[in-house]
């Protein structure tokens, strides 16, 4: 399996990193774009969040198409179209065009993350899926950090060739998605039997290992699993987690700017929580695997996030507030690694695609609700204290729902 991991996971991690850059770069653009096109905090929040509404609407259809046409073609299509639309964000001139482009971008990206999660089930036996998921999810906080380091310098191109700096930012940061989409189209393979870098006996063994658990469930049992109350709880856990995550991440540059930092300082300071989270999430996942335990790690991660956001809101604009946000970020990303390692998504065929997409799509509604709540509760467009308290409440609610899930013995094991 080491050969499979080294062949697939670096590319998947890079794809996911670029995806996360694309999702958060609008928060850095907002430092100057909001003024240039006349957006207040509430209007920006609506535009930043509407991305997730279209993501939600198109996610399940996108994942079902992926199951039919294959990962190579469909993931490449997703990356190329989101790259084109992300670059087109440079053309927005006001609230209406900003909303339209953000909606189209969400529709283009729909199915990407659950598609990768589903792809893992095509290549990795059950005993390897948790670590495989953790390894490529590690790139999520790094994508946020890289976005800050790249975006703010690009904002300084203001006036070059008659364009605003944020316009250059959107154009430049669309290129990696376009290029990677072409790479995926050329090198990614859908199933083990299609590759030449595995020996014949290795291909046959791997196909047996990944197909056995898929065939162990009847279609009726699979659909029943998707619709039961435990699946609903998973969706709500991910929803409330994402409300806290995106409510903070899509406003972090504005929060830091409101604390008196220059744009250059914001670009550096905004990377700190995400670099910290990347390291912390790896340690958290390692400890979870060491203990062979998931639920308490998920609960503890969300309680840590709730505490960090509460302390940050209480402290206001200070260095210690950034430290508290960093603690919260560790919990938010650690939760995701453990959450996606739970086994109920290991179904087969179209049911597997629908199950993964349904939980992720419902969860991604939090990407709309969280930022919108933070935006409309901002006092004077610069004081986000109320929003941080509310996001802390979302994290605490996610922990409570996770405890209920554990009591229901969702995984029926010591996971």
Where are these regions (language model features)?
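Extracytoplasmic
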Residues: 7-41, 147, 248-253, 370
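Helix-breaking motifs and short loop linkers at transmembrane-helix boundaries and internal kinks
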Residues: 38, 70, 91-97, 108, ...
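Conserved MFS/SLC helix-loop-helix module at the cytosolic interface between two early adjacent transmembrane helices
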Residues: 57-96
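Glycine-rich segments within core transmembrane alpha-helices of 12-TM secondary carriers
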Residues: 131-152, 176-177, 360-370
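Cytoplasmic membrane-interface "Motif A"-like loop-to-helix N-cap segments
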Residues: 67-79, 289-302
